[in-house]
Amino acid sequence: MKLKELERPAVQAWSPASQYPLYLATGTSAQQLDSSFSTNGTLEIFEVDFRDPSLDLKHRGVLSALSRFHKLVWGSFGSGLLESSGVIVGGGDNGMLILYNVTHILSSGKEPVIAQKQKHTGAVRALDLNPFQGNLLASGASDSEIFIWDLNNLNVPMTLGSKSQQPPEDIKALSWNRQAQHILSSAHPSGKAVVWDLRKNEPIIKVSDHSNRMHCSGLAWHPDIATQLVLCSEDDRLPVIQLWDLRFASSPLKVLESHSRGILSVSWSQADAELLLTSAKDSQILCRNLGSSEVVYKLPTQSSWCFDVQWCPRDPSVFSAASFNGWISLYSVMGRSWEVQHMRQADKISSSFSKGQPLPPLQVPEQVAQAPLIPPLKKPPKWIRRPTGVSFAFGGKLVTFGLPSTPAHLVPQPCPRLVFISQVTTESEFLMRSAELQEALGSGNLLNYCQNKSQQALLQSEKMLWQFLKVTLEQDSRMKFLKLLGYSKDELQKKVATWLKSDVGLGESPQPKGNDLNSDRQQAFCSQASKHTTKEASASSAFFDELVPQNMTPWEIPITKDIDGLLSQALLLGELGPAVELCLKEERFADAIILAQAGGTDLLKQTQERYLAKKKTKISSLLACVVQKNWKDVVCTCSLKNWREALALLLTYSGTEKFPELCDMLGTRMEQEGSRALTSEARLCYVCSGSVERLVECWAKCHQALSPMALQDLMEKVMVLNRSLEQLRGPHGVSPGPATTYRVTQYANLLAAQGSLATAMSFLPRDCAQPPVQQLRDRLFHAQGSAVLGQQSPPFPFPRIVVGATLHSKETSSYRLGSQPSHQVPTPSPRPRVFTPQSSPAMPLAPSHPSPYQGPRTQNISDYRAPGPQAIQPLPLSPGVRPASSQPQLLGGQRVQVPNPVGFPGTWPLPGSPLPMACPGIMRPGSTSLPETPRLFPLLPLRPLGPGRMVSHTPAPPASFPVPYLPGDPGAPCSSVLPTTGILTPHPGPQDSWKEAPAPRGNLQRNKLPETFMPPAPITAPVMSLTPELQGILPSQPPVSSVSHAPPGVPGELSLQLQHLPPEKMERKELPPEHQSLKSSFEALLQRCSLSATDLKTKRKLEEAAQRLEYLYEKLCEGTLSPHVVAGLHEVARCVDAGSFEQGLAVHAQVAGCSSFSEVSSFMPILKAVLIIAHKLLV
């Protein structure tokens, strides 16, 4: 964009790079005339001040010249003196060469003209000063004259070559080499460039264009490479720029053709050797990147030709352009808005016409919008490369680099770059507290640690929390919890004794034991009988006197018609139930309780319930809870003002198994229904229950803004509570949840950022398999370097993928049925899906001896459970067809672990390894097909039909057969492999039954078919046409077809149709209780998302998810999922309940990456979609 402008029909020259301030010299051009048609010449100097927002240049000096100028150069000769600003050399008409002292021009003092020579015969159009020796000046004119002047002695110049050796033509340009100070080149209109060696005073090479249409208008040497130069052509027929290398001077290295008309000027940037600036007759100024031959900057000049462009030596982003319309403009290649220039022009005009007041705004009609911005260079130039840089590295490291500064008068030399690595620590208090925690955990002195924390706490809630944490480390924790809540037996004993004026023992259980009443009665009866068995029998009168004391008043049994009489009759008849009813009706509750106790446990329980329901007092609800032991009602219905009393009840009465759950319920209710203060107090409930995960979640609700010290407070409590749980359950009984893992990972990252790598690694959970923890542990281990030598490296936290491994191969297999021909079936390209079900326990499908074609095995196959007794009957199998088995099967359904091949989980195995088992299809004449889908296999074990038995012979190579896709997957079928353990041959003979033990060497025995079963007619419909009963069982199975090949000789009457099989219905099992929470979490998530979703697409996706998740529940009912998949799903459900969807997606990715695709493909993708939707909706 334009920075400055000057209206002068002149040639130009920049001040040297060492000159400050920056100047621009102009001399009246000999090729132009102004409006006055004056032929006088003028030399002017202007100061270039970019801090001035105006477009005008500041005039600093002027001098009348004897002639006009064709060329101006400004050199640093003599600038070593303090008062010198260099020398300006001008070339004029009639061979005139004039030297000016810049200092004298600026000061307007002494005579500025140093010398004036007229040696050339024509106009001097080419001038250049040597960059290494500032006193050497090269000048060129007509008749091929080139003189080398020594500014110290201008009397006798050096002449290059002789006129006889050179044809007489003008010198268009001269340029000194930028690397070799004795090399000079000249450009001629004929299209050639001559390179001179001043040491030999002769040309060493001539470069010319073979087309003879190249009219050179300028040349420039490469700033860094001594043997390269560019030539530009002013011919409109060939407006090109040629890049030559003198080492390969037969043809140019590059030819650039960006201009549409002849090129007038060229300038090579000394700050960035890849930038070449040119101006041409097409009114454009272009800047090219010579490395890529791309135009990186384009500036239109509004239909004016620029005959001279020059880079600024001091500011590399600025260049000047002198045009034939009489203007010299300064531009920047870094880009700038046009609006700035327009505003400046408008302000300038307004200031000229205004009378002390601003002009009114002008309503300008809307014009065609122009480009408001001139884009900068497409490629960042070399001069804006950072001289220094800084970057943070893992572990709190700060990496810096820099280049040593070089004085301006010295040539930069290559030097090694220095890189500094320093340790940055910003949280000293955080590190100190972390070290104290680690020391307390290592020494085991956590009681004193908790005591100190309690004393240092400023808030009462924090002090109480630390006291609770301390109690978790002590014995008899429940009684101490009660004491902290304000309930002590000793204090109560004193209060009751004061109230009753007597001592009351409170150490007994608040309830009598179940047999206390009966035992008391037996003891009383035995003691009464012992008196009469140890003494001799007395007289009859003495005996009755003892039984009935003489002074006892005889009592009567009421037989009246009032309530007492009815009670007497009921008791006399042993009807205790009606007697209790009468007592309750008359509100004689004590009598009712006594009678109910005599009537048994059920009657006593009913009486207590009716009493508690009828008698409503302030303490009746508490009595009901104590008597009925319904602690859940206490947690759910009590007032939150009495949360301390509710927690005290749980501490006193609740059993060990239910206590943690009830405490968590109370804490959750305090979080959801209580105030912020109650949310903070809920942490005490979680400490009592030992729920670290709930404690962390509660802390996250109370601390929205995370700071290092707040995280340190949390980790101190988490580590103390975790250590108390380890004392109770052992070191392997505590596994962190997603919220805890997330915060611990944050804490370890923060420690690592402060440089405490070993401390950070010590706080990570040892047995946690979550990816963030494993990745951080691996990174911390390797970041410590030699500090962990001798320690075992943690497992690699990322899945290993074998790139370029052959996943499948084409092989052949022989089937000896009659003539025993062999067939080859082409194998389609493998898909990243594999189905490896497990066969039924009652039917071993693989021999104990492996096939010689089985290759190495390195990874476990997914576990598919065999169907239970409720499974439907297996499909029949044609005689002579034996299913392929993926792994050996032991008696009783025990599974033999067979590793999968090395590679990405869920890919096809390597050649030779046992491939997934496909459910058998039906054989018909001339065909062999496996038309079953993998999903049907776990429900349908195999059973053969037809006479004959299978005999094993010499193993043969396997043959690939097409196998249909998984349900719901369109496309061509995949391939599977028939067994490689033997050759199947039908053999007539008696029908034997299948055995549960594996048959030796692959010989399989078969059950007899039912006598009433008749083989159907040959197949005329698709094989997978299921009966209505089977369609009801598997509604999602698509129809499948397969390409089949079979050897001849298979009898057609043995082919069976699937729809003629005796159907059996299978009832869907109920979801096991341990998985009910899984279903509840996912269904609740779907409901929340449906309520929050607004667009129709998301709602349809959620409806589809509800249907697809049924596949998951079905697999959970059947028990066909691998244990690690089930565990991962429960972990995802925990993340869903905690609202941590990002952590849930991380667990999902881990489970999906470590599982067989066919095992999880029906529900894992839609589960991921639901988690993403929930994360977006913030449910």
Swiss-Prot record:
List GO terms (cellular component aspect). COPII vesicle coat; endoplasmic reticulum exit site; endoplasmic reticulum membrane; vesicle coat
Q: Which GO terms describe its molecular function?
A: structural molecule activity
Under the heading InterPro entries, the entry gives: SEC31-like (IPR040251), WD40/YVTN_repeat-like_dom_sf (IPR015943), WD40_repeat_CS (IPR019775), WD40_repeat_dom_sf (IPR036322), WD40_rpt (IPR001680)
Give me the ranges of the annotated region Disordered: 812-856
The segments carrying the WD repeats are 17-56, 67-110, 119-159, 166-206, 209-254, 258-298, 301-341, 391-422
> Which tissues is this protein detected in according to the database?
Ubiquitously expressed at low levels with specific expression in thymus and testis. Expressed in testis by Sertoli cells, Leydig cells and spermatogonia and in cerebellum more prominently by Purkinje and granular cells (at protein level).
What is the membrane topology listed in the Swiss-Prot or TrEMBL record?
Peripheral membrane protein
**Subunit details:** COPII is composed of at least 5 proteins: the SEC23/24 complex, the SEC13/31 complex and SAR1. SEC13 and SEC31 make a 2:2 tetramer that forms the edge element of the COPII outer coat. The tetramer self-assembles in multiple copies to form the complete polyhedral cage. Interacts (via WD 8) with SEC13. Interacts with SEC31A.
Question: What is its biological role?
Answer: As a component of the coat protein complex II (COPII), may function in vesicle budding and cargo export from the endoplasmic reticulum.
Gene3D superfamilies from the xrefs?
1.25.40.1030, Functional domain of the splicing factor Prp18 (1.20.940.10), YVTN repeat-like/Quinoprotein amine dehydrogenase (2.130.10.10)
One of this protein's Pfam families, by short name? WD40
Name this protein carries in UniProt: Protein transport protein Sec31B
For biological process, the GO terms are: COPII-coated vesicle cargo loading; endoplasmic reticulum organization; protein transport
Q: How is it modified after translation?
A: Monoubiquitinated by the BCR(KLHL12) E3 ubiquitin ligase complex, leading to regulate the size of COPII coats.
Where found, per UniProt? Cytoplasm; Cytoplasmic vesicle, COPII-coated vesicle membrane; Endoplasmic reticulum membrane
Q: Which family does it belong to?
A: Belongs to the WD repeat SEC31 family.
Q: Which controlled-vocabulary keywords does the entry list?
A: Cytoplasm, Cytoplasmic vesicle, Endoplasmic reticulum, ER-Golgi transport, Membrane, Protein transport, Repeat, Transport, Ubl conjugation, WD repeat
* Polar residues bias: start-end ranges: 814-826
The answer, when asked if Signal is one of the entry's keywords, is no
